[in-house]
Amino acid sequence: MATLILSFLLLLLATKLPESLAGHCTTTTATKSFEKCISLPTQQASIAWTYHPHNATLDLCFFGTFISPSGWVGWGINPDSPAQMTGSRVLIAFPDPNSGQLILLPYVLDSSVKLQKGPLLSRPLDLVRLSSSSASLYGGKMATIRNGASVQIYASVKLSSNNTKIHHVWNRGLYVQGYSPTIHPTTSTDLSSFSTFDVTSGFATVNQNSGSRALKVTHGVVNAISWGFLLPAGAVTARYLRQMQSIGPTWFYIHAAIQLTGFLLGTIGFSIGIVLGHNSPGVTYGLHRSLGIATFTAAALQTLALLFRPKTTNKFRRYWKSYHHFVGYACVVMGVVNVFQGFEVLREGRSYAKLGYCLCLSTLVGVCVAMEVNSWVVFCRKAKEEKMKRDGLTGVDRCSGSHS
């Protein structure tokens, strides 16, 4: 039952649609209205536009958010290659270091920018198709730049004849040094901020990495159930059910079934993690990855150890039990810690999914405490009974000795 509850609560996370579907877009701003809009797959961004086919001109507005009061938000197009930052011509909005007012400057992202050979300097765009641009904060003149503040970047783009597709990029950063925006964060989401859309149909072709969100959620749900709940539950059954003489050796089969199910599900989750790492070159979550490898290795050793389990009469049995307990508990601790690391990687540190997992884990811990207290009560009661029996036998022996 607890596993079903955990699965349901974690599926609250799994049912969260990607931002491209869950986000909202608008065709109306304070100064202008547009015909079409789409939500972009990352950073809760969106874009609205009106296409004028008679002169192949595109009027658009990009909606983004600041992640720092001293940060920047940018949008641009790549006239040559889709899914590429290098070669893009971008417009970046940030607070003027002198006046603090929002300004919008043009930049060309050549290969030196990616290599970070020097600061990014503003220069006129060598793209005659970008005819006008401006930026404003949501809220008008009284609005201030702050963490989470919305910005609107307006632009007019002249498209080539017979071409209604536009390759565009967008991103945001934490700091601006003078008039030089610094590098944006390098999470998988930030590295996936590009797509191609058709201005006539509104159909967007997003990058392949945008689908990784669903894969990450699947990875998280499977691992939370396996490493984060089933393995601890299996350890609990081994510790407390075997003390119940009424069920005999049944406790062992229950323990083995739970642990084997957890390991098989964990193997699936671990494999998904490998796929995610392969699909995200340059993105590494060091601690999460190291804990995952260590947990899977420990679980594999536990499974293999069953093949070499000595009989109860074997003199090496006690050494095997010590090894089995140590590796097992280490695997459980690392697995639970890594589940919480996974919530941070998914940026779900304050989500209902994490709350649900914490409730299920707390319930399991509560059961452990109750069973542990019960075990000590039973142990103390038996010890007292044994002592009374010994004292009684001693008294009888003394009486027998005195009469003789």
From Swiss-Prot:
Domain DOMON: start-end pairs: 43-173
Keyword rRNA-binding annotated: no
Coiled coil: none
Cofactor binding note of this UniProt entry: Binds 2 heme b groups non-covalently.
Residue numbers binding heme b 1: H219, H288
Keyword line: Electron transport, Heme, Iron, Membrane, Metal-binding, Signal, Transmembrane, Transmembrane helix, Transport
Family annotation (Pfam families): Cytochrom_B561 (PF03188), DUF568 (PF04526)
Binding site for heme b 2: H255, H324
Alphabetical list of CDD domains matching this protein: Cyt_b561_FRRS1_like, DOMON_CIL1_like
Function summary: May act as a catecholamine-responsive trans-membrane electron transporter.
Stated name of the protein: Cytochrome b561 and DOMON domain-containing protein At2g04850
Taxonomic source organism: Arabidopsis thaliana (Mouse-ear cress)
